[in-house]
Curated annotation (Swiss-Prot):
InterPro entries: Aldose_1/G6P_1-epimerase, Gal_mutarotase_sf_dom, GH-type_carb-bd. It comes from Escherichia coli (strain K12). One of its GO terms (biological process) is DNA damage response. The gene is yphB. SUPFAM superfamilies: Galactose mutarotase-like. This is Uncharacterized protein YphB. It comes from the Bacteria. CDD domains: Aldose_epim_Ec_YphB (cd09021).
């Protein structure tokens, strides 16, 4: 495992080639993402990529253009093919400078055969990450992208992200029924604290922008996705699930498609890529000092 360090002014970024994950993002000594453990395990990191799609496909199967495809579980602790392969694979460095890095990963087994590049770039106040995935298989398939960033959480943390509804969670951490009425504790259309309880829900009607305020540290993070991501997930763990969890981090995950879009007509917001075709998504995290 190799750790690549980028810096620009007071910003510093650590990225690992194992999983293509971010292992830390700081302004001087202030963590802007949860510091990673540099363990080689993506769920211990600060952020990991979601490719060739995000979240899960119920039943580990989908029908596309008249053909049925069967996915296989890819981690021991989940019954589903979870978050794709990029977060579990070994990436290769193709370029590295003081403030920029580009990694690539190729996957040639299972249903999806593809090549993905992930470019990181720092400016004085912004981290920009760009994912570009190319279908290297023999068939047209539905693709999506996203990221799984972990943010510091305190009682003072506030988040704001537009939504017109959300999916309930059902068994095996799958997205369930869609509800247009947001409960007060999950309504982030205006800045609001996160509930001190388990949350694992997707939100629809997003404009691709979010604001995460950390007043105790004197800063806010402004997330922006290009093209605007239509969905985000909020994850807050629980000590009953993770014995070491102390309500000290949460995830706000931008996704280019809704959960389980493989089962929606024409793949929902998933993008059909013919062999050789590509799709690109970008996430920026801008630091604003309060």
């Amino acid at each position: 495992m190799t750790i690549y360090t980028l810096s620009h002014g007071s910003l510093k970024l650590d990225v690992s080639d194992q999983g293509g994950v971010i292992e830390g993002f700081w302004r001087d000594t202030t963590p802007l993402l949860r510091p990673g453990k540099k363990s080689g395990v993506a769920t211990d990191a600060s952020c990991f990529p979601l490719v060739p799609f995000a979240n899960r496909v119920s039943g580990n199967r989908f029908v596309w253009q008249g053909r049925e495809y069967q996915l296989q579980p890819n981690v021991e602790w989940d019954a589903h093919y979870l978050h794709g392969d990029g977060w579990l694979g070994e990436w290769q460095c193709v370029s590295h400078s003081d403030d920029s890095l580009c990694l690539v990963y190729e996957h040639r087994s299972g249903v999806y055969h593809y090549r993905v590049s992930q470019a990181f770039h720092l400016t004085a106040d912004t981290l920009t990450v760009t994912l570009s995935v190319t279908n290297q298989g023999a068939e047209t398939l539905p693709f999506g992208t996203g990221w799984h960033p972990y943010f510091p959480l305190s009682p003072q943390t506030r988040i704001q992200a537009q939504a017109s509804g959300y999916w309930l969670e059902r068994e095996q951490w799958l997205a369930g029924e869609f509800c247009e009425q947001l409960p007060q504790e999950l309504d982030f259309n205006q800045p609001a604290p996160l509930p001190r309880q388990w949350v694992n829900n997707g939100f629809a009607g997003w404009n691709g922008q979010a604001r995460i305020e950390q007043p105790q540290e004197g800063y806010a993070i402004i997330m922006e996705t290009t093209p605007p991501a239509p969905c985000y997930f909020i994850f807050v763990s629980d000590p009953a699930f993770d014995k070491g969890y102390a309500f000290d981090f949460f995830c706000l995950e931008p996704m280019s498609h809704a959960p389980d879009d493989h089962h929606r007509p024409e793949g929902g917001d998933l993008i059909a890529l013919a062999p050789g075709e590509s799709t690109t998504s970008e996430m920026s995290l801008r630091v604003e000092w309060l």
